[in-house]
Amino acid sequence: MSTASNQSNVPAPAWTLTTPFHKAPYPAISPSRLELSQAGKTVLITGGNAGIGYAIATAFLEASAAKIIITGRREGATRDAAASLTAAAANPGGKAVGVVCDVGDALAIDALWKGFEKEGTGVDVLVLNAVKVADAKPLLESGLGDVWSAFDVNVRAQLQMVERFYKQKQEGRVPKNLVNVSTFAIHNHLVAADRPAYGLTKSAAALALQLIAQDTSPETMQIVSMNPGAVLTEAAKGAGYDEESFAWNSPDLPGRFAVWCASPEAAFLHGRFIWCEWDVDEIKSGEIRKRIEEDPFYLKVGVRGL
């Protein structure tokens, strides 16, 4: 990790919404805060066996979640990740379970939720983290098949997961909380200019959740999309990046930020998009909070200038 990634905050970039601009966890998003407690809850995290998803699972266990369910495509990796999470859990009663599920397969998602129903498992928090990073090609050179494959994972699978989550048969499990791990490529198209299918499909997913939030109260299902920032995951290393490529975020920053997003403190962000580097105390108060309350389009997918 670079030096910057090990600091709680660094000088804020000119384009950020808040100062400070965090690169590592800080007290306001600590899972040990009673206000962020996930005690007794079951949390489902797609793509939770490594990287950001694993950090999110760790943070929810630190927040006293009763059960973490992580999904992954590889049985061994998913099983081992769940075992490691359980062994390291700060909460003695907390446990993690690994379930093989390829979200690119609609039948696999149906089977996952049917399994929950059969065993009487109700999910309280859904974290949408699984993603398909499209090839580095212009849209018209990628081919319709490859672009649609990205839509299948990044949009169709997300909608299917949300529908099954929302329509669970277990009664009385409200409010539900949904955290969407998004990307700042949804509003800065130059960031992933070499992978336009990625930005396209992640934008579509964020917009879909934004529209769902229009018709769903946060008291029923709270929805927040977050940008996890730059984290040096194994996938990033596989793409050729190393510790010197960026001032990387600590993976614990998006991990703990996801817990905050699933708490009542984040209810005012229902249907909106936020960066995990932004300071939550600053967002909760002052001019930023005032604009959120007055502007229904602020921090949402849309057209600038209108």
Listing of model-derived features with the role each one plays in the protein:
Residues K132, L144, Q170-P218, G229-V231:
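Catalytic loop of short-chain dehydrogenase/reductase
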Residues N129-A136:
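Conserved NAD(P)H cofactor-binding loop of Rossmann-fold oxidoreductase domains
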Residues N49-A50, R74:
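Conserved glycine-rich cofactor-binding loop
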Residues A65-A81:
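Conserved glycine-rich Rossmann-like NAD(P)H-binding loop of the short-chain dehydrogenase/reductase
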Residues A88-L107:
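Rossmann-fold cofactor-recognition segment
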Residues N6-N9, P13, P20, S225, ...:
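C-terminal helical subdomain
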Residues K137-L139, D146-W148:
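Substrate-binding pocket helix/loop in short-chain dehydrogenase/reductase
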